[in-house]
Amino acid sequence: YYASRGLGDVYKRQLTTRHDRYTVFSLWDTFRNVHPFFTLAYPQKQLDMVQTLIDMYKEWGWLPRWELYGNETLTMSGDPAIIMLADTWLRGLKKFDAETAYEAMIKSATAPGSENILRTDNDDYMKLGYVPLREQFDNSVSHALEYYLADFALSRFAESLGHKEDAQTFAKRSLGYKHYYCKEFGTLRPI
């Protein structure tokens, strides 16, 4: 899959896993309930899954969003691996490579859109604090809301690692959802 995007030949990559390796991550769906549950009920499996994500970053250069049998599908939106990794750490499961995880999170949250396979609209998001509506039904609000969640999780993770300036930056960015709030209708709307 990555070969078609010019990011390397997936068939020649060296796997880095030294533990149970997992696949078929539907992180867009599972970061909300499955992975928090695993931190409580199956902590070792959760740690192996976390390390699998970090290994995928080492192999591919990006955290996965919706990985399927060793290939990133880029299905759905957002940056859910950040949330899953940070949530695991903040719940006290810390036996994983936090600095590499942090490096991967920062890359995803800050790389320009033209270079970013997870946040292709990151230029507007970083400059304006939101993703503007470009065409009807473009999902700009849902993209940005997913980024705000990831940035909040990243701010908490950064704070726990002692990266205070990054923590403040991402906490501030996470409040951008307020751009979308429409008082007249009491809902979030595209801008």
Predicted features, each with a name:
Residues Y1-L7, Y11:
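Single conserved hydrophobic/aromatic residue that forms the stacking wall/gate
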Residues P64, S155, L161-I191:
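Catalytic cores of carbohydrate-active enzymes
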